[in-house]
């Protein structure tokens, strides 16, 4: 079964029916300018990728349509840094997110046709 939650070193991402929910500590949320519990709907998400920090730790990066793209990882409200051993889990989670986005886009296109 696919992983529907990732717990990182600076937050957590939950995969829900409505989109992704980012949970952060108070200080992490303030540093990113968001609430501690931050929801992003599927329609707002362009995709997700796995990146890495300069020290080699995996980072899940979620691209959101209306979000600025010039934020550094530590200030990006849609990025979660993980432990080094979690690269496989991050890759599976990103694949699940991207598959969900593609499925919803196909549904939207079929509904418009």
Residue ranges of predicted features:
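Acidic, Ser/Thr- and proline-rich intrinsically disordered linker/docking segments
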Residues: 2-11, 33-113
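Short, compositionally biased strand/turn segments
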Residues: 10-33
């Amino acid at each position: 079964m696919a992983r529907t939650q990732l717990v990182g070193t600076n937050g957590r991402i939950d995969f829900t029916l409505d989109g992704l929910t980012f949970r952060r500590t108070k200080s992490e949320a303030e540093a990113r300018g968001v609430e501690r519990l931050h929801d992003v709907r599927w329609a707002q998400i362009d995709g997700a990728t796995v990146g890495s920090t300069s020290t080699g730790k995996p980072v899940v990066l979620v691209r959101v349509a209306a979000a600025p793209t010039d934020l550094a990882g530590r200030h990006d409200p849609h990025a979660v840094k993980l432990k080094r051993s979690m690269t496989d889990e991050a890759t599976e989670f990103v694949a699940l997110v991207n598959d969900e986005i593609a499925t919803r886009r196909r549904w939207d296109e079929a509904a418009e046709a």
